[in-house]
């Protein structure tokens, strides 16, 4: 590492909506600062997962340290790359807390989008210096002046320092580097000598264990120090090594000092021991107060995951355990279902987080899985005054004991072209939304603020929004409060037996339509048996919808050539009695495809 000068350090982040060119600009910055040799360069270098490259999203934060010569001085530029999606907003807030500035990347053709808005507000709360960057300036559809006006009027940023760039051609990249040095303030000189370092991420390495990513606020951290975590007040650990991101994690001699970004390794074996947002200090000279802003990450969306082949249970257990090593937000609990066998109840930060985990299980571990419909945490207030929190229909108590139910609501911002306003209002009305306000973003686009139940968001809201706005709508949400709701348990009965895998918690207004659609779907996917099968949807034992799978017809009178009708009647009566007995004692075989199809629909 170069000689240490706190005034020559610049810590910054990049804020952008999906597909606005964040990872490509990061690539160009790495090239321009010669952080990586040309022969080792590849697209989206900081996005290490194939999934990140394919989807064009950042799932895990990737820091990198660059050096840049400017006016005879050598500067240390620490880029702390952040996930852009709303599911990871707490991680974003902690990454921003490690910075003094941020680049706001906006597509010069598409303009400001919902996700960039959400993260800009997080940066403004931290009082970061924000540099607007208009990317894709080389596109024929680029409207730099109109987009600048949007940023000024809607976000309230001064756009006099806006940089026009093209990550594709490299235009504007030197100006970005110079602006970071000129405009982003260096870290404040520490007021105390005790070690205080902010944990903004962690990573499990099979050889060295947990690598803890930190930004040092005061003091220094070096090999041999005995450290502890202030918010979690856990055990103490010896630092076995420190390192920097050049761009790969590289062990180094010396120490990490105030203002610097790097990582340390200690004898930590579980990511759960390391909480994002916690404060690291030494045991010998501990800091008096931890850094502000720490909170426990709690899952928001829950779903059951079961192997299609029950013999794959141990493989699934191993797969989830490995994924959890690098994902402290993923919670896992073993459960069993009468119809699906043994599986796991998993908690996620949101729908994107859930999709990523499902996709990684099938890709990296080659497993076929069934996932139950995503659910949220409901609050059940009982008549005896007790309060329960449930995320699984099987935990739903006897309705006679319930005083009332409450469900989580969210604040949603939707950005859309004006012509789709009525479509979005209809969609939000269907999802039980409450309109708070409507603002003009520019002469063509609107920002709609809504309150919606979280349960309506986690099902198919994103798909429907893209559908009604022809792909032009975008949204972000933040958790609000719990509100009373008429939430009930919908059960599906097949041949008069409840199938737990199809049970779900729904709002009373939607119960009948949901029950009917599940029954109709099951009629299509369950093959006919030798007897008639009733498929029913029920609420509190009251049937609200019914479909019937007709029996396979066998012609028992085929051998009677002519002859007396009484002979045929005897055979028909015998068949009827046999079918009745079969209906009482026969088991309906439900194929796996039926579960997959219905749960896909949910």
UniProtKB/Swiss-Prot annotation:
PROSITE patterns: G_TR_2 (PS51722)
Binding-site list for GTP: 19-24, 135-138
Ranges where the tr-type G domain occurs: 7-188
Swiss-Prot/TrEMBL GO biological process terms: positive regulation of translation
Keywords: Cell inner membrane, Cell membrane, GTP-binding, Hydrolase, Membrane, Nucleotide-binding, Protein biosynthesis
Location in or out of the cell: Cell inner membrane
InterPro entries: EF-4, EFG_III/V, EFG_V-like, EFTu-like_2, LepA_C_sf, LepA_CTD, LepA_IV, P-loop_NTPase
Role of this protein: Required for accurate and efficient protein synthesis under certain stress conditions. May act as a fidelity factor of the translation reaction, by catalyzing a one-codon backward translocation of tRNAs on improperly translocated ribosomes. Back-translocation proceeds from a post-translocation (POST) complex to a pre-translocation (PRE) complex, thus giving elongation factor G a second chance to translocate the tRNAs correctly. Binds to ribosomes in a GTP-dependent manner.
Sequence similarity: Belongs to the TRAFAC class translation factor GTPase superfamily. Classic translation factor GTPase family. LepA subfamily.
HAMAP family recorded: LepA
Name of the protein described by the UniProt record: Elongation factor 4
Organism: Chlamydia trachomatis serovar L2 (strain ATCC VR-902B / DSM 19102 / 434/Bu)
The encoding gene: lepA
């Amino acid at each position: 590492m170069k000689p240490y000068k706190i005034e020559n350090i610049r810590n910054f982040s990049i804020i952008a909506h999906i597909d606005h060119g964040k990872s490509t600009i990061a690539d160009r910055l790495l090239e321009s600062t010669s952080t990586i040799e040309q022969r080792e360069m590849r697209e989206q270098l900081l996005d290490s997962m194939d999934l990140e490259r394919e989807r064009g999203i950042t799932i895990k934060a990737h820091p990198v340290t660059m050096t840049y010569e400017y006016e005879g001085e050598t500067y240390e530029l620490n880029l702390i790359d952040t996930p852009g999606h709303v599911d990871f907003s707490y991680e974003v807030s902690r990454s921003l807390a490690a910075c003094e500035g941020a680049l706001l990347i906006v597509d010069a053709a598409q303009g400001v989008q919902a996700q960039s808005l959400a993260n800009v507000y997080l940066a403004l709360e931290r009082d970061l210096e924000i540099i607007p960057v208009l990317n894709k300036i080389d596109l024929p559809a680029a409207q730099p002046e109109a987009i600048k006006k949007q940023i000024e009027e809607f976000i309230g940023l001064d756009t006099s320092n806006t940089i026009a760039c093209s990550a594709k051609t490299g235009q504007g990249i030197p100006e970005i580097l110079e602006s970071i040095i000129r405009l982003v303030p260096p870290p404040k000189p520490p007021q105390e000598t005790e070690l205080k370092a902010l944990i903004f991420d962690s990573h499990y390495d099979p050889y060295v264990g947990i690598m803890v990513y930190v930004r040092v606020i005061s003091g220094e951290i070096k090999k041999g120090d005995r450290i502890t975590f202030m918010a979690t007040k856990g055990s103490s650990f010896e630092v076995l090594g420190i390192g920097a991101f050049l761009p790969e994690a590289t062990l180094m001699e010396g120490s990490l000092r105030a203002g610097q970004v790097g990582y340390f390794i200690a004898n930590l074996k579980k990511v759960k021991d390391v909480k994002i947002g916690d404060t690291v200090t030494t045991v010998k000279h501990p800091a008096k107060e931890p850094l502000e802003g720490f909170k426990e990450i709690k899952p928001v969306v829950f779903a059951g995951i079961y192997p299609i082949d029950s013999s794959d249970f141990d493989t699934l257990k191993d797969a989830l355990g490995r994924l959890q090593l690098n994902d402290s937000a993923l919670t896992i609990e073993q459960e069993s279902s009468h119809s699906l066998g043994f599986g796991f109840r998993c908690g996620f930060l949101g729908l994107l987080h859930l999709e990523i985990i499902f996709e990684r299980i099938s890709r990296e571990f080659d497993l076929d899985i069934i996932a139950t419909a995503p659910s949220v945490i409901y609050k059940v207030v009982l008549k005896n005054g007790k309060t329960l929190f449930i995320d699984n229909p099987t935990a739903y108590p006897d309705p006679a004991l319930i005083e009332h139910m409450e469900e989580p609501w969210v604040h949603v911002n939707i950005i859309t072209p004006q012509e789709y306003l009525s479509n979005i209002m209809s969609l939000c009305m269907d999802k039980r939304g409450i309109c708070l306000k409507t603002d003009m973003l520019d002469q063509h686009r609107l920002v709609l603020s809504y309150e919606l139940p979280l349960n309506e968001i986690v099902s198919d809201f994103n798909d429907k929004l893209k559908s009604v706005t022809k792909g032009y709508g975008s949204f972000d949400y933040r958790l609000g409060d719990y509100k009373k709701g008429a939430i009930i348990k919908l059960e599906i009965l097949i041949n008069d037996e409840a199938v737990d895998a199809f049970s779900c918690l729904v709002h009373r207004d939607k119960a009948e339509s949901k029950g009917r659609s599940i029954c109709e779907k099951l009629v299509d996917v369950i093959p006919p048996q030798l007897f008639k099968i009733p498929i029913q949807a029920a609420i509190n034992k009251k049937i609200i919808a019914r479909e019937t799978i007709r029996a396979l017809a066998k012609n028992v009178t085929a051998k009677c050539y002519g002859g007396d009708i009484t002979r045929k009647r005897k055979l028909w009566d015998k068949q009827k009695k046999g079918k009745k007995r079969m209906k009482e004692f026969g088991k309906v075989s439900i194929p796996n495809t039926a579960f997959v199809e219905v749960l896909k629909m949910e």
